[in-house]
Amino acid sequence: MTFMQQLQEAGERFRCINGLLWVVFGLGVLKCTTLSLRFLALIFDLFLLPAVNFDKYGAKSGKYCVITGASDGIGKEFARQMAKRGFNLVLISRTQSKLEALQKELEDQHHVVVKILAIDIAEDKESNYESIKELCAQLPITVLVNNVGQSHSIPVPFLETEEKELRDIITINNTATLLITQIIAPKIVETVKAENKKSGTRGLILTMGSFGGLIPTPLLATYSGSKSFLQSWSNSLAGELSKDAIDVELIISYLVTSSMSKIRRSSLMIPNPQQFVKSTLRSVGRRCGSQERYATMTPYWAHAVYQFVITETFGVYSKIVNSINYSFHKSIRIRALKKAARQVKKE
């Protein structure tokens, strides 16, 4: 091979490498631009855009909001804040006495109509769903909040999970959510169609997701899977109902003080139900921390930033995040078992 031929080959290799470098550079610029735009959207959604006006969902016009799991925690706070916005309410939960107390509180404070239904959704009886149908048959409903949910009593390996706990989680988080939505969503479609002729009212379906569904969670495997299912189901439903002027949103939360989380004190990362619901209703229809996900929102600012960092660095399905999650819940399990052992000794 002559010197000129060698020089020519070297030039061709250089052009090839140079082209590859430009491709890498272009992809890097695209990634940085996308990341920057997502971060700006995060900031706008969380802090700069005004609060959502619920008049478009029928607030103060006699329309009803149906809330499941409404007697405690996040569900109870949804009831309070939706009543404050002027919605009549249908509250569904297990404990009659708690529902009656909340009914009186909301009717006295906000002068709205509050209907209550006490059923145990874990029983998965047809009569439960018939009761919901009868109660809601003649009501102009525009909003549904699928809040009812259940987790494990403590973190537990899947192979040691009791069958009843496993079945209850799937029944409450998935089966009941789907069946109740099948009952209420047609009522929302009907109400919106009737109202659109006059006022352009929209419908809204909110479903509580979880970081447990966002990130695979060892030692909470059944709960994690049930919430991950809701992500795909809710996104699919959003695509189906958009033509009917119904907004469907999955709400992702990290820890919130509640009886289910067993956390009593709030902190920077752990809001109380009032703070969490306020941030949710302020930002309905905005992705906040879920910038890469359709029809999904992570509304509380600390949760949103946490999700953004995980998503844009390691990724929610990475081994390192899975391992960290496992260690975190393993430590919770150890503490819970020690506490249970101490209580047994006292007895």
From Swiss-Prot:
One Pfam family hit: adh_short
Keyword Cell membrane recorded: no
Keyword Membrane belongs to the record: yes
Broad class of the protein's primary localization: endoplasmic reticulum
Pathway terms, separated by semicolons: Lipid metabolism; fatty acid biosynthesis
Recorded GO CC terms: endoplasmic reticulum membrane
GO molecular function annotations of the record: ketoreductase activity; very-long-chain 3-oxoacyl-CoA reductase activity
EC number per UniProt: 1.1.1.330
Residues at the active site: 223, 227
Known catalytic reactions: a very-long-chain (3R)-3-hydroxyacyl-CoA + NADP(+) = a very-long-chain 3-oxoacyl-CoA + NADPH + H(+)
Location(s) in or outside the cell: Endoplasmic reticulum membrane
Keywords tagged on the record: Endoplasmic reticulum, Fatty acid biosynthesis, Fatty acid metabolism, Lipid biosynthesis, Lipid metabolism, Membrane, NADP, Oxidoreductase, Transmembrane, Transmembrane helix
Record: residues binding NADP(+): 66, 120, 147, 223, 227, 256, 258
Record membrane topology: Single-pass membrane protein
Stated family: Belongs to the short-chain dehydrogenases/reductases (SDR) family.
Subunit structure: Interacts with the fatty acid elongation system components ELO3 and TSC13.
Record function comment: Component of the microsomal membrane bound fatty acid elongation system, which produces the 26-carbon very long-chain fatty acids (VLCFA) from palmitate. Catalyzes the reduction of the 3-ketoacyl-CoA intermediate that is formed in each cycle of fatty acid elongation. VLCFAs serve as precursors for ceramide and sphingolipids.
Cited PANTHER family: HYDROXYSTEROID DEHYDROGENASE-LIKE PROTEIN 1 (PTHR43086:SF2), VERY-LONG-CHAIN 3-OXOOACYL-COA REDUCTASE (PTHR43086)
Protein name: Very-long-chain 3-oxoacyl-CoA reductase
Protein source organism: Saccharomyces cerevisiae (strain YJM789) (Baker's yeast)
